UniProtKB/Swiss-Prot annotation:
Pathway: Protein modification; protein ubiquitination. Residues 132-151, 252-271, 347-357 have a biased composition (Low complexity). It comes from Homo sapiens. Broadly expressed. InterPro entries: RNF111_N (IPR029306), Znf_RING (IPR001841), Znf_RING/FYVE/PHD (IPR013083), ZNRF3_Arkadia_E3_ligases (IPR051073). Residues 66-89 have a biased composition (Basic and acidic residues). It catalyses: S-ubiquitinyl-[E2 ubiquitin-conjugating enzyme]-L-cysteine + [acceptor protein]-L-lysine = [E2 ubiquitin-conjugating enzyme]-L-cysteine + N(6)-ubiquitinyl-[acceptor protein]-L-lysine. This is E3 ubiquitin-protein ligase Arkadia. Changing residue 386 to V: Loss of affinity to SUMO1 and SUMO2.
Length: 994
């Protein structure tokens, strides 16, 4: 920050002022900001925003209020606007206090409208006026916590104007929100853009910029005044330095955004003081381009896109989200005019390192779409604070772009950013991939300036290039969210994300301009949705997604902010879904292993929040996707999470979310089918990615069709296919890298399916075994064979069931590891048992899973292990047969005597009470003893039947002299030739008896 000139400090002060709560002062703040912004050339005049834009501005202001903190640095860049911005900043301060949430957004809407009116009044033809409108927007919307909270301005002109004002106001408010969350220092002047950047909603951008708040200088020239132009030139140089610093700080920046979620997440929060205004500017620029008319999400900031290229890179909209607050600084005209699409994206990319770090060209539109999905008009520039220009993800995309366009200014800024970013690698995801990000960022910037198509090619290139650089980004992701740690690769995929996103960018890049569409138009619906750009898919982007979103913001700032500020992250992840956010989402998506692997597009799609964000990312809503995921976390499988494979925490959640998100906000331009199909395809990274990418491309191409969240999917299926191949190709490269995540997720799904099938199978087979005909078989002499047959029956009885079998086989066919199963694979013995489903699976690889369950059933275990037929008979059958034979031998030994032996060894006779005399004698003896004997004493009992032996009954006396009924003892001796009483063998006594 020491680098910042006093002007920057002043701007920072203004930023602080703007951060101040301005509930009802929004109009005044707008006027103040207007005054400040009026000094610059009439961006507002060049682009008047309709009432819709004003509403968007309000929302944007609210959403960006958190970024406003970071935007302060960018405000510094807006030194030209300092004077007017100071006024506006005062209002912003007030607004910051106000930023409470959606209600503030509503206030911001009104304030934005007021600002819009002020802006229209002030509406000097200077681009700076637009900036000042933007500042006003920041101030006015600032009153609302969420950028998109304020009502969306209906008319496009109003939207643009309002967007400007709303962005400014919202920046202030968002900034306050961020300040609250992050408490980042605002002593230094922050441009409105810086304010926007502060907003966590501008997660992607602010995340990027937050790390490099010092880069705020780049965004300094929001006003297009002569002084500011000079300042812009000077600041461009500063930006280069700051870009390095920014990229070094980038992690911090993103952390600052994510500070809302968790300051500890990343150093980025520590960068609060730095206030990554650059990120904001770049982000804003991306967002500004092609702001489609329509309702703005709370996180959407509309910045008039001035066709005049007066503003240099410095004049980007400075959006910084340091304390989870977004500050929107007026978008530099330079970026606006530069943007080939009339979007600031290119210029933003060029304009600031942060912009460079955040590929803005095609993304600019997507950024805009991120910021002001509803504001479809190109005139209105939407600043997506969600996307951090410093976002590594975005940067990766930019890398290729930058390579193609090689805008020296952007590259220079970006490279310095890279150095700084590298420094902050640990701080945030971006920090992890700072160099790459800065490089890609520069590339992106250049591409933005040069053109979307070039940007696309570059992006494609970047996709692959960024993929490698992606890994560095991962650290940042982890810092912001452990979920993303699993996606360390994914985080690197941030770059990868950037890549896929880059491809996405490539697709979207071109289309992003149009694409700005703001598929996020629905997002306004979910102003508070945590870092969900898609209001339509707020649920789809769970907070967990937010965490992923942070990662998704290439800058990590975006990711962090999203984490820190769900609502703010909304812009950041989804709204920002500028290249940066998009990449971040994909890469960061914990749930999207794929997303983490540069299937950025695909990745996010697969990754958490992948559904919504994949489109977003594909739409160039890197942040959006990031924000959507969330399946961060856990990681889930970012976006998996895990998004496609999101089956992981974020993965499973993300997957649905991702799809929904795609369907909802991001798929605006895409056919709903693609969005919907991805849920399953999510994990089929290639196809879902294509679907999502195509959708995104479609969005980019048909962003104008910013249909409601529901329709956004159907918007442009055809364009998507075209871009799909390119996007897919990049994703293909990345999918290889992503492949592990993709397969990881896919394998997860496969494993899950297999597990389910296995459990079903095991339940039935287990029950069958529990029934245990098999075990009874053991007793059978032919137990081995019977068992063999029986097991197949038990195993196959259930497998034979058509439903189960179809399910199991379907699971296998779907890609389960057992997919290799074929009926022929079954052992010949088992073939006839229809064990096909179960046994096949056991044999094919499901078997290992089943074996533990079957451990209790040796026959099953042996069959499983011996499905090949070799061991089935050998160990299993042989052992049982031996046991059976042994039993038989033992049984024969213990079986008892034959009837002849019994007759020969025993003495059968008719029972006679021969002992009467003895009894009588005893009786007499007993009497003598005084004891009375009873006949019972003389009676003998058969101990087998316990009946008293009667005279004349057939009895048999054993060699041991024990007497039993013949019938009773014969039955006993047949089974056991030992005396039931004394256990003496009847034959053993023969010799002695004989």
């Amino acid at each position: 920050m020491s680098q910042w000139t006093p002007e920057y400090n002043e701007l920072y002060t203004l930023k602080v002022d703007m951060k101040s709560e301005i509930p009802s002062d929004a109009p005044k703040t707008q006027e103040s900001l207007k005054g400040i912004l009026l000094h610059p050339e009439p961006i507002g005049a060049a682009k008047s925003f309709p009432a819709g834009v004003e509403m968007i501005n309000s929302k944007v202001g609210n959403e960006f209020s958190h970024l406003c903190d970071d935007s302060q640095k960018q405000e510094k860049e807006m030194n030209g606007n300092q004077q007017e911005q100071e006024k506006s900043l005062v209002v912003r301060k007030k607004r910051k206090s106000q930023q409470a949430g959606p209600s503030y957004v509503q206030n911001c809407v009104k304030e934005n409208q007021g600002i819009l009116g002020l802006r229209q009044h002030l509406g000097t033809p200077s681009d700076e006026d637009n900036d000042s409108s933007f500042s006003d927007c920041l101030s006015s919307p600032s009153s609302s916590l969420h950028f998109g909270d304020s009502d969306t301005v209906t008319s496009d002109e109003d939207k643009e104007v309002s967007v400007r004002h709303s962005q400014t106001i919202l920046n202030a408010k968002s900034r306050s929100h961020s300040a609250r969350s992050h408490k980042w220092p605002r002593t230094e002047t922050e441009s409105v853009s810086g304010l926007l950047m502060k907003r966590p909603c501008l997660h992607g951008s602010s995340l990027r910029r937050l790390p490099c708040r010092k880069r705020f200088v780049k965004n300094n020239s929001s006003q297009r005044t002569q002084k500011q132009k000079e300042r812009i030139l000077m600041q461009r140089k500063k930006r280069e330095v700051l870009a390095r610093r920014k990229y070094a700080l980038l992690p911090s920046s993103s952390s600052s955004s994510e500070n809302d979620l968790s300051s500890e997440s990343s150093s980025s929060s520590s960068t609060e003081g730095e206030e990554d205004l650059f990120v904001s500017a770049s982000e804003n620029h991306q967002n500004n381009p092609a702001v489609p008319s329509g309702s703005i999400d709370e996180d959407v900031v509309v910045i008039e896109a001035s066709s005049t290229p007066q503003v240099t890179a410095n004049e980007e909209i400075n959006v910084t989200s340091t304390d989870s607050e977004v500050e929107i600084v007026t978008v530099g005209e330079s970026y606006r005019s530069r943007s080939t699409l009339g979007h600031s994206r290119s210029h933003w990319s060029q304009g600031s390192s942060s912009h460079a770090s955040r590929p803005q060209e095609p993304r600019n539109r997507s950024r805009i779409s991120t910021v002001i999905q509803p504001l479809r008009q190109n005139a209105a520039e939407v600043v997506d604070l969600t996307v951090d220009e410093d976002e590594p993800t975005v940067v990766p995309t930019t890398s290729a772009r930058m390579e193609s366009q090689a805008t020296s200014a952007s590259i220079n800024n970006s490279n310095p950013s890279t150095s700084e970013q590298a420094s902050d690698t640990a701080s945030a995801v971006t920090s992890s991939q700072p160099s790459t990000v800065s490089e890609t960022s520069a590339t992106l910037t250049s591409n933005s300036t040069t053109g979307t198509s070039i940007g696309d090619d570059s992006r494609r290139t970047t996709s692959s290039a960024v993929t490698e650089t992606g890994p560095p980004a991962m650290p940042r992701l982890p810092s912001c969210c452990p979920q993303h740690s699993p996606c360390g690769g994914s985080s690197q995929n941030h770059h990868a994300l950037g890549h896929p996103h880059t491809s996405c960018f490539q697709q979207h890049g071109h289309h992003f301009q149009h694409h700005h569409h703001h598929h996020h138009t629905p997002h306004p619906a979910v102003p508070v949705s945590p870092s969900f750009s898609d209001p339509a898919c707020p649920v789809e982007r769970p907070p967990q997604v937010q965490a992923p979103c942070g990662a998704n913001s290439s800058s990590g700032t975006s990711y962090h902010e999203q984490q820190a500020l769900p609502v703010d992250l909304s812009n950041s992840g989804i709204r920002s879904h500028g290249s940066g956010s998009f990449h971040g989402a994909s890469a960061f998506d914990p749930c999207c292993p794929v997303s983490s692997s540069r299937a950025a597009i695909f990745g996010h799609q697969a990754a958490a929040a992948a559904p919504s964000q994949p489109l977003s990312s594909i739409d160039g809503y890197g942040s959006s996707m990031v924000a959507q995921p969330q399946p961060q976390p856990p990681p889930q499988p970012s976006l998996s999470s895990c998004r496609h494979y999101m089956p992981p925490p974020y993965a499973s959640l993300t997957r649905p979310l991702h799809h929904q998100a795609s369907a909802c906000p991001h798929s605006h331009g895409n056919p709903p089918p693609q969005t919907q199909p991805p849920p399953q395809v999510d994990y089929v990274i290639p196809h879902p990615v294509h679907a999502f990418h195509s959708q995104i491309s479609s969005h980019a191409t048909s962003h104008p069709v910013a249909p409601p969240p529901p329709t956004h999917l159907a918007s442009t299926a055809a364009p998507i296919p075209q871009h799909l191949p390119p996007t897919h190709q990049p994703i293909s490269h990345h999918i290889p890298a992503t492949a592990p995540p993709a397969q990881r997720l896919h394998p997860h799904e496969v494993m899950q399916r297999m597990e389910v099938q296995r459990r079903r199978m095991m339940q039935h087979p287990t029950r069958a075994h529990e029934r245990p005909p098999p075990h009874p078989h053991r007793m059978h002499p032919n137990y081995g064979h019977g068992h063999h047959i029986h097991v197949p029956q038990t195993m196959s009885s259930h497998p034979r069931q058509a439903p189960e079998r179809s399910a199991w086989e379907l699971g296998i066919e779907a890609g389960v590891t057992a997919a290799t199963y074929t009926p022929g694979a079954l052992h010949p013995h088992l073939a006839h048992y229809h064990a096909p489903p179960r046994l096949h699976h056991l044999q094919l690889g499901a078997l290992p899973l089943m074996v533990p369950d079957m451990a209790g059933y040796p026959h099953i275990r042996y069959i499983s292990s011996g499905l090949d037929g070799t061991s089935f008979r050998g160990p299993f059958r042989g052992n049982f047969e031996e046991l059976i034979h042994l039993e038989e031998r033992l049984g024969n030994v213990n079986r008892g005597a034959s009837q002849g032996t019994i007759e020969r060894c025993t003495y059968p006779h008719k029972y006679k009470k021969v002992t009467t005399d003895w009894f009588s004698q005893r009786k007499l003896h007993c009497k003598q003893d005084g004891e009375e004997g009873t006949e019972e004493d003389t009676e003998e009992k058969c101990t087998i039947c316990l009946s008293i032996l009667e005279e004349g009954e057939d009895v048999r006396r054993l060699p041991c002299m024990h007497l039993f009924h013949q019938v009773c003892v014969d039955q006993w001796l047949i089974t056991n030739k030992k005396c039931p009483i004394c256990r003496v063998d009847i034959e053993a006594q023969l010799p002695s008896e004989s």
